[in-house]
Amino acid sequence: MPPILILLTLLLPLRAGAEEIIGGHVVKPHSRPYMAFVMSVDIKGNRIYCGGFLIQDDFVLTAAHCKNSSVQSSMTVTLGAHNITAKEETQQIIPVAKDIPHPDYNATIFYSDIMLLKLESKAKRTKAVRPLKLPRSNARVKPGDVCSVAGWGSRSINDTKASARLREVQLVIQEDEECKKRFRYYTETTEICAGDLKKIKTPFKGDSGGPLVCDNQAYGLFAYAKNGTISSGIFTKVVHFLPWISWNMKLL
């Protein structure tokens, strides 16, 4: 997709159902080289855009709800971006050859909200484009651990447009039992709860699929936050889906 089309979509309000960063700060340009800007467009021109992250030169992980429900839709991934509204020399725009939502994905409760994207061509590794490591199968995060999530989301609750520049916020891993009280369908087996109960800091609109980074590894990807309660968000637990990710990458 030509860069100008991406610029035009960012002039539009965020689509309901996407998620964005609330709070946080603008990161040093290209200091998060794994970040991907994911766009899904159907035949009528309806767009969904999300975050995602490069895990191999030709594979990106994002949220399953970032896929347009229309059968006739296309997806593109932009890598190496900092200011998504600018035509940066570092950017690599690559069409998606195949999207693979998890077969157990439930759009109502965001269960198994994870999707693997196979790119049409391999990304060229540069200082602005590099994969993010996945954790080992026995790796865990615990309550109190501090992680981060980045994206091009809004800077405030009332802002309906995406941020031009990549922003990041630090989040604290929360107790599972506390999150079960606030999120009816929260499942600790497949999800991680992170945020800050005392501050308004969380992903919320326009940044679904962005990685929860702990110790330079992707432990989660952003799935959803509770309307009216944005002190924390729910992330799909990457460790739980490692066998599924590995299997599909070998098949393609």
Curated annotation (Swiss-Prot):
InterPro entries: Peptidase_S1_PA (IPR009003), Peptidase_S1_PA_chymotrypsin (IPR043504), Peptidase_S1A (IPR001314), Trypsin_dom (IPR001254), TRYPSIN_HIS (IPR018114), TRYPSIN_SER (IPR033116). Residues 21-250 form the Peptidase S1 domain. Pfam families: Trypsin. It comes from the Eukaryota. One of its GO terms (biological process) is proteolysis. Keywords: Cytolysis, Disulfide bond, Glycoprotein, Hydrolase, Lysosome, Protease, Serine protease, Signal, Zymogen. GO terms for cellular component: cytolytic granule. This is Granzyme D. Its main location: other. This enzyme is probably necessary for target cell lysis in cell-mediated immune responses. It is found in: Cytolytic granule. Disulfide bonds join C50-C66, C147-C214, C179-C193. Belongs to the peptidase S1 family. Granzyme subfamily. It comes from Mus musculus (Mouse). Residues 19-20 form a propeptide.
